[in-house]
């Protein structure tokens, strides 16, 4: 029987993924780690809930999850704002939670990822990590750091002869999540959660939801003239 760990799983897409995994017969335990508590109206017999602040210095907390074969990192935050309106504390916190914490978690489980046994690892990144926008300057920078980090580690894994990969999930705006102080609505995130799990278990390295419908054109415009696309996003 399998165990999963969802970091940031108390709300939003993380909770939707945790619920999907818990409904499957092959998973016996789904660990949820979040700074916040799981909502009282959400419960599942397979859930094991733990509270942890990703800005903490000591990550030995995660040594207890030695039996997992699935790691999904969905923790992160951000909101629309120009750089001039961001505080220095906000800059430090968003880089720590969105980027540094993910790298530390991957480091903790790297021996499991870089092995011949199946290990499924995914990270919620963002389409903001692929392009510039004045309203996502630091948020986008934190996600761009993850994009390059994941791509680099995946090449390292490939060259070492391992089949496991880290999945970069880079959506645009997701309805039903807590981004920009939104509220969790599991009815709106269920479909995306299923798609993410499918790509995770296929050991894909990149999943951009609505790529053909929306983001293929946007990314091409950005590639053609990133300055013009930045001005377009500002307007």
Language-model features, listed with the residues they occupy:
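N-terminal Rossmann NAD(P)H-binding glycine-rich loop of SDR-like oxidoreductase domains
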Residues: 10, 18
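Substrate-binding pocket helix/loop in short-chain dehydrogenase/reductase
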Residues: 82-83, 90-93
């Amino acid at each position: 029987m399998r165990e999963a760990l969802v970091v940031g799983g108390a709300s939003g897409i993380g909770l939707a993924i945790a619920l999907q995994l818990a409904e499957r017969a092959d998973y016996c335990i789904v660990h949820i780690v979040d700074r916040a508590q799981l909502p009282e109206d959400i419960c599942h017999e397979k859930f094991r809930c733990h509270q942890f602040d990703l800005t903490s210095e000591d990550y030995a907390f995660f040594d207890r999850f030695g039996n997992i074969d699935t790691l999904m990192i969905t923790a992160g935050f951000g909101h629309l704002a120009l750089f001039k309106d961001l505080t220095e504390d906000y800059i430090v916190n968003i880089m720590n939670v969105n980027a540094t914490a993910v790298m530390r978690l991957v480091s903790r489980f790297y021996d499991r990822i870089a092995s011949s046994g199946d290990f499924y690892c995914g990270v919620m990144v963002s389409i903001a990590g692929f392009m510039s926008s004045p309203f996502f300057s630091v948020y986008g920078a934190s996600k761009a750091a993850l994009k390059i980090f994941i791509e680099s580690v995946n090449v390292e894994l490939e060259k070492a002869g391992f089949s496991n990969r880290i999945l970069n999930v880079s959506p645009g705006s997701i309805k039903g999540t807590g981004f920009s102080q939104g509220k969790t609505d599991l009815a709106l995130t269920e479909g995306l959660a299923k798609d993410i799990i499918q790509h995770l278990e296929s050991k894909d390295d990149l999943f951009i939801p609505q790529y053909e419908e929306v983001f293929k054109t946007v990314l091409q415009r950005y590639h053609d003239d990133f300055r013009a696309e930045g001005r377009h996003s500002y307007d």
